[in-house]
């Protein structure tokens, strides 16, 4: 077991497995924030919303936190396992079952949209902590 000195002051005797689970979920949202910022910088324009899928998108806490941290609307479809669905749609297009991509789009529905609820000052403090943790981890990794 390796102990990272960057997080040693954040782990106490009161830290539970639930805290680790929450931190893991939140880290996904922070990483998404970093990727979105890089994409926006490369594109030269703002991304307003994200369409999500996959198993993690079923977690309402994660989706809300992701919207809070990124400031983007997070849109979850009714069917979250879209890999298989996409293959089925392509097969349907190839066989003529679906006449156009537009017909497929009409068939899709939104389960839920998450919009930012967290106040800016809290988001800014959380992002400051995330950036500090990333810098610390990078320094720690460089020392290895």
Language model regions located:
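Glycine/Thr-rich phosphate-binding loops that ligate phosphate moieties of nucleotide
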Residues: 8-144
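Short, small-residue-biased leader/transition segments that mark boundaries at the very start
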Residues: 1-7
